[in-house]
Amino acid sequence: MITEQNLEKFRVQCENIFTQIGRDVIGQKEVIEGAVIAMIAGGNVLLEGVPGVGKTRLVRSLGRVFDLPFSRIQFTPDLMPADVTGTNIIVKGDDGNSTFEFQPGPIFSNIILADEINRATPKTQSALLEAMQEHTVTVMGVSRKLEEPFFVLATQNPVEQDGTYPLPEAQMDRFMFKIIVKNPSLDELMDIVNMTQKTMAEVADAACNGDDLLEMRKTANAIPVATEVLKYAMMLCSATHPDSECASEAAKKYVRLGASPRAGQALISAAKVKALMNGRYNVSYSDINELAFPVLRHRMKLTFEAVAERVSADEIIKMIIDELVEKTKIKDEKSAAPVVTATAEETTAVDEGENKKRKLFGRK
């Protein structure tokens, strides 16, 4: 059961998180929001952007703000799987006998920064697969559980591709979001330069801890989703498949392989968090449409025709959404989705939900 106290606590914690991150990272509002949503929802994040736009700084700031142990792994072509997961070493005891002792690798932390992940070989990249999905690490036949909460936040440079190894579909699918980190605006760039002239120190303080984060996730998971909204979200994911009964014309022309069921899971989990952040009891169609881009852009394999015409994944997603909105005759508004009350027992009109939201968050 969701109470007003739960929602108020969630709101205050989110405000504190964004405030503290903002002390370290200037601008990048959408990037910060996406990373926080994914972490609360329990997903991994792939940050893609050119060097110098603050990807690594953001991840380090997240570690401090959530007060969680942080490990950085710099991926290079000579990095081996054992350098990530750890390995057994021979240790001689006091009695003179030698035994194997496990030496944990940097993966045994709560927040993992996989810096320039596409520079490592596929063999090393695959060392993250089990950890990202099952939150376990198997070395020499022995599985070890990773401490919760556990996140992988990876970075990659989309421009410099020489000597890199594109991530395989199996690993890309394990990232809840792929977030594009853009260059700062002129005003943001001026603020960045002014700040760094004074100090380069990262000053964010802890806003919550691991237990708080798990509690926020539990609160978000309890948010109900209206059947109509859930069906719309699943239709959107299915519409990315060119051979699906829900296939859009854009997918038939430009998509070779659509999103997996993980996309649907990620979309709903993230939409619940976003609804709470916006002070609503319900997941709306707009939540689904906005989050479709980071959830789907890395899960679609494009056709040669799309590459030749330079049609991006985001443009295809926009076409699919427009076609689906027209097909289902829904309004792309937050008020289009049914609202479920805090008791999760009755469905009320949207106006009631909006009034409760204003009351909770002190908005006029």
Where are these regions (language model features)?
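C-terminal engagement/docking regions of AAA+ P-loop ATPases
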Residues: 1-2, 243-364
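Conserved C-terminal "switch" segment of AAA+ ATPases
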Residues: 6-11, 24, 164, 178-250, ...
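Pre-Walker A (pre-P-loop) alpha-helix and adjacent loop at the N terminus of AAA/AAA+ ATPase modules
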Residues: 8-53
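Conserved alpha-helical scaffold flanking the Walker A/P-loop in AAA+ ATPase domains
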Residues: 34-36, 91-113
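Walker A/P-loop
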Residues: 36-77
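P-loop (Walker A) phosphate-binding loop of NTP-binding proteins
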Residues: 50, 84, 155
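Canonical AAA+ ATPase core
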Residues: 91-95, 120-124, 132-223, 272-274
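Walker B catalytic acidic pair
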Residues: 115-116, 127
